[in-house]
Amino acid sequence: QPISIGFQSRLASFESYIRNNENIFFPVIYQPFTEIKYMMGDKKEQHLEVLFSREFLPNLFITLNYDVDFSPGVYKRSKMQNSFFNGSLRYNTKNNRYGISGYYYNNKIDIQENGGIKYDSIFTNNTETDRSIIDVNLDDATNLIKVAGFSIDQYFNILSQNVNKSKDSTYKERKIDIGRINYHFAYQRNRYVYEDTDPLSYFY
């Protein structure tokens, strides 16, 4: 694909770590469900995920999901934490004539920036095996990315719905359905903050 030149609001290098409405789901379950996952890597990387869903009232389903990844990094100033939360709800009337669904999501990525190591020869010659003490170009720079949004969807069937599927001699199948009214509203806010307490550093 061709690469566009100029200002872009997209954060291409972080897109793989940012989740949005495509990652929201609306499970229909009739028993409370909870799932917890935890993993730790050999470099103290950690991953935690919690998923909870249940039917709170008849036909009212609520789901909550929290996901966080943490890495202390190998080099100086390379710590990273990526967290994601979303909640969704879904409700429809018993006759399915009216329904509403909605969701909220929030991404937060907090990254230390080091600008790379100062002297490439230390790496190429492997003169220092402890990467955590190798000098880097930036000592107090951070990247903060926040992406949050919510949405509401509603529908109303103009004609009542046939919810009785048992076809007896009194059942008459509707031949014409005049449709339904749909409403959709969505909002997303993007925030990207790069900060360095030493903006006059020779690195820039």
Q: Residue spans of the language-model regions?
A:
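Repeated loop/turn-to-beta-strand initiation elements of outer-membrane beta-barrel proteins
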Residues: N59-I62, N95-I100, Q161-V163
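Extracytoplasmic loops and strand-loop junctions of Gram-negative outer membrane beta-barrel proteins
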Residues: Y17-I18, F33-E35, D69-P72, D130-D140, ...
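Face-selective signature of the C-terminal outer-membrane beta-barrel domain
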Residues: I133-Y204
